[in-house]
Amino acid sequence: MRSYYVCSWHAAKMMARQKSGLIVMISGYTGVTYTYGVLFSATKCTVDRVARDMAIELEPYNVATVSLWQGLTLTEKAKDNLAKAADKMTGSVAGQSGSSVEHPGRVIAAMALDPAIMDRSGGTFITAEIADAYGVVDVDGRRIESMSAKRGSPLWGPVRENDYHGR
């Protein structure tokens, strides 16, 4: 959690000066469903909350913060684990086709170009669903499916949606 906060703090200082920016924190479905254990789940819940609270503090500077739930990302390590022990993987991974490591970057790039990004600030979003909203596909042309029906949905919407500013 410390690295999320420290990196965001430094980025926010630069972005606030220029009165624009987007900070994206990568989280996951484990924010609402058991995945790898208490510490992992608690950390991801905290990531979502930090993105939300930062949105409130950074709104006057036109800096947006969001948390994205990525789901299964086919990193080299994930591919290796699936090849070695797919039968032992948790139910949280079963049934997911996964995305390339490039997919979230494509989604973040689309978000960064959105002139209305502040309307999403403070929200937690499923990367696959945001990809659909922006028309983003994976490097092989596939549409990545949301796992929300099986794994749950985010708790936090954008701060502007509820006009919530902690007052």
Predicted regions mapped to residue ranges:
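Residue-level detector of anion-binding/catalytic polar loops
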Residues: A64
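Hydrophobic positions on the long internal alpha-helix
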Residues: S3-A11, V50-A51, M111
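A glycine/serine/threonine-rich, flexible loop-to-helix segment
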Residues: P60, W69-G98
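Short aromatic-enriched loop/helix-cap "lid" or pocket-rim segments at secondary-structure transitions
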Residues: G37, K77-N81, Y134-V139
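A structure-centric feature marking long, well-folded core domains of fungal metabolic enzymes
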Residues: V6, K77-A78, R106
